[in-house]
């Protein structure tokens, strides 16, 4: 009873704090000079991380096994992973481009985990025989950590694409307006006035364009490094899973739906890392591959569980309303 109460307290405290953190981050987006609210939000994420850690430890003691046996527990661990990725760079770089991504991801995953849709699987249960192994911690934790890192890196790539294509669109729109005035000959004086107005506008926006260029460069930088970290975790997770599968089922690989999509995920991000080594494909080109990887991860992690088939069917679930 006491462990259930502690779990309930940790869940609500962490969710409340991360909700406040999101609001603070939205406020700080209005200006880079607002430092105090930003520092408060970072301290809030540290408290959230500690609460999620307490939640996992409490559930571990309460259930008698490491909390990675079902979707609810994996979502809590995923939230913990997002908060970990959030606070680790904070001690080295006070402000980076991961903060908004990780904070939003934390509240999204934890909000879904604690919603009424997963009420049936929220109560701890006895592990099925296939999960009663020391490999559970190694394999599943590496896979969830890889999902967290790859999702963060992919979202940074999505942000890079949005900024890049908006920049191209506005540049194309401005150039077409100049050509339209010139071709229809509204008069030399009127044309020159319109042209000068646009040039002045572009001049005043040059600083903004420079900032966008720097932002795109930083997004590409962080995306590459976070995805590289996630790829390492994914590789370790797949290899440890293969060893565990051989011990449990007598085969390293059986092309189970979960295994197949994990392999597809690995291939997609291997392609990303490969083309990223070519300077001509850095930026938007490699970001397109990472964006595709974002969709693949959700299919691998969440979509396959909806099927409820294969050797990983113990992780399946049904959505219910409270």
Curated annotation (Swiss-Prot):
Membrane topology label: Multi-pass membrane protein
One example GO MF annotation: heme binding
Domain of life the protein comes from: Eukaryota
Location in the cell: Plastid, Chloroplast thylakoid membrane
GO biological process: cytochrome complex assembly
Pfam name, any one: Cytochrom_C_asm
Family, similarity comment: Belongs to the CcmF/CycK/Ccl1/NrfE/CcsA family.
PANTHER family in UniProt: CYTOCHROME B_B6 PROTEIN-RELATED (PTHR30071:SF1), HEME EXPORTER PROTEIN C (PTHR30071)
Protein name: Cytochrome c biogenesis protein CcsA
Organism (species): Lactuca sativa
Gene: ccsA
């Amino acid at each position: 009873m006491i462990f259930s109460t502690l779990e309930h307290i940790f869940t609500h405290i962490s969710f409340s704090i991360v909700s406040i953190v999101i609001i603070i981050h939205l406020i700080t987006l209005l200006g880079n000079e607002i430092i105090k609210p930003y520092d408060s939000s970072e301290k809030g994420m540290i408290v959230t991380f500690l609460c999620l850690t307490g939640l996992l430890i409490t559930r571990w003691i309460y259930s008698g096994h490491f909390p990675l046996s079902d979707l609810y527990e994996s979502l809590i661990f995923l939230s913990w992973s997002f908060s970990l990725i959030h606070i680790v760079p904070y001690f080295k770089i006070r402000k980076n481009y991961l903060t908004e991504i990780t904070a939003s991801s934390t509240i999204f995953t934890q909000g879904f985990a604690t919603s009424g849709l997963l009420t049936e699987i929220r109560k701890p249960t006895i592990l099925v025989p296939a999960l009663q192994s020391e490999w559970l911690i190694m394999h599943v934790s590496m896979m969830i950590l890889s999902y967290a890192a790859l999702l963060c890196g992919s979202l940074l790539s999505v942000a890079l694409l949005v900024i890049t294509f908006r920049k191209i669109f506005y540049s194309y729109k401005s150039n077409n307006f100049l050509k339209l005035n010139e071709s229809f000959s509204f008069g030399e004086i009127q044309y020159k006035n319109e042209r000068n107005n646009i040039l002045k506008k572009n001049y005043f926006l040059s600083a903004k364009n420079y900032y966008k260029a720097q932002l795109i460069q930083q997004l590409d930088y962080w995306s590459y490094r976070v995805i590289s970290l996630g790829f390492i975790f994914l590789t370790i997770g797949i290899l440890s899973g293969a060893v565990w599968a051989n011990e449990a089922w007598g085969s390293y690989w059986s092309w189970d739906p979960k295994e197949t999509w994990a392999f597809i995920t690995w291939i997609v991000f291997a392609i990303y890392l490969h083309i990223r080594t070519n300077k001509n494909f850095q930026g938007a080109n490699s970001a397109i591959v990472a964006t595709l990887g974002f969709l693949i991860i959700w299919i691998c992690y969440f979509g396959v569980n909806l099927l409820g088939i294969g050797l990983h069917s113990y992780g399946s679930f049904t959505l219910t309303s409270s």
